[in-house]
Amino acid sequence: MVRVLPVVVLLLLALPVRADEIAVPAGQGTLANAIAGARPGDVLTLRAGRYEGAIKIDRPLSITGPEGAVIDGMGQGTVVTIDAPDVTLRGLTVTGSGMNSEALDAGVKILKGADRAVVEHNRVIGNLHGVDVHGGRDAQVRSNTIEGTRQVRVNDRGNGIYVWNSPGTLVEGNSVRWGRDGIFSNASRTGIYRDNLFRDLRFAVHYMYTNDSEVSGNVSIGNGLGYAIMFSNNIVVKDNLSLSDISHGVMLNYANNAEVSGNLVRGGAEKCTFIYNAHKNLIWGNRFEGCEIGIHFTAGSERNVLTGNAFIGNRTQVKYVGTRDVEWSFEGRGNYWSDHPGFDLGGDGIADSAFRPNDLMDHILWSQPAAALLTGAPAVQLIRWAQSSFPATLPGGVVDSAPLMTAPQIAVSDRYTALEADAASRRNESEMNDLDVDNLTSH
């Protein structure tokens, strides 16, 4: 019996301790005290009412509550700091962070070592940064409503979701409005950012030095720029919408080996797509519609494949300043051009004549803008007629040897169409007063 008792005690100690569900009343200091007294794995259930921030969660816990449970930082620092693994924050309102940009004040901050955090179904309102994933691995930020601040200068605002050096982050199903960027991902990798809605921001999604990640199924409406992929490699950008964004829909700047597919950009952006010093990218099955420039291709971008895209009703379909021929078809399949008067006698869906979207006068106008005064002159019209009649006189540029006869269709729901119309009606009232996306050193 003496020998058996220690064995029984050891077995009992090895059994998992049952997590408790603890009701936490609203009031000053009640939440901080409840965290201090909780055991790992406990569930703290808040009641409707106001709770004092700033709080630090330093052990694995779940904190849940109704939307009426408000954690308020009262303008001081970060409202909720997660500093332990396996923490869940669900169903709450988080508001009132400080406004210190150097300290990265936020509604919710996930620190290094706080792996597998889950932040879901919360309202994160009126903070400098909404959710700052700052070193924690495999975080999940899902189905939150995040609304930032509206300082006069957009660049003085914080980001809805900031991901820094946090591999494996999943950002899914969030609605982000106001602030600077919807998602700003910096020095990270293997993230998935999908099915989010972004409105009234500088950039919807902004990548810097982020590799091996995915941006898919997102909707950007009325932002300064939709999807900015910068200094990043091996990114998948697919099935996103950019509706009535102001400057660009999709931008690849020093981005390599990306796959850009199934995206729709429409509604009057200056450039549907901007490709700047980006190499070996596959751009296919996209629809670029109703922009000043369909695609601007510059700074020596090489070895890119463009096939199966549609360029529809853009004032200038392609802006490419170069003297070399660049082929924009792949394996006998090119792109659809709304201004190509082609015909298809073979009935295979491929036009029987190649298409060049630009001519010599386009190159002259891009390099010498003052020449625009001469565009109506008979000599200019004669040059354009001669080049259309004798293609061998063209100086080089984009050539599509297998233009498509039909355009890919990408559906937009009634809800997003209504939001697009609202954003278009407010375009002249945009808050993007200090936006200069073409200054590529400023991001």
What are these regions (language model features)?
Residues E21-E52:
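Acidic Gly/Asp/Thr-rich repetitive segments characteristic of extracellular carbohydrate-active
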Residues G73-T81, E102-L111, G126-V133, R153-W164, ...:
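Extracellular beta-strand/beta-solenoid scaffold signature
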Residues A14-P16:
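N-terminal signal peptide c-region/cleavage motif recognized by signal peptidases
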Residues A36, Y51-T64, I71-R116, H129-G136, ...:
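Extracellular beta-strand-rich solenoid/capping regions of secreted or surface-exposed proteins
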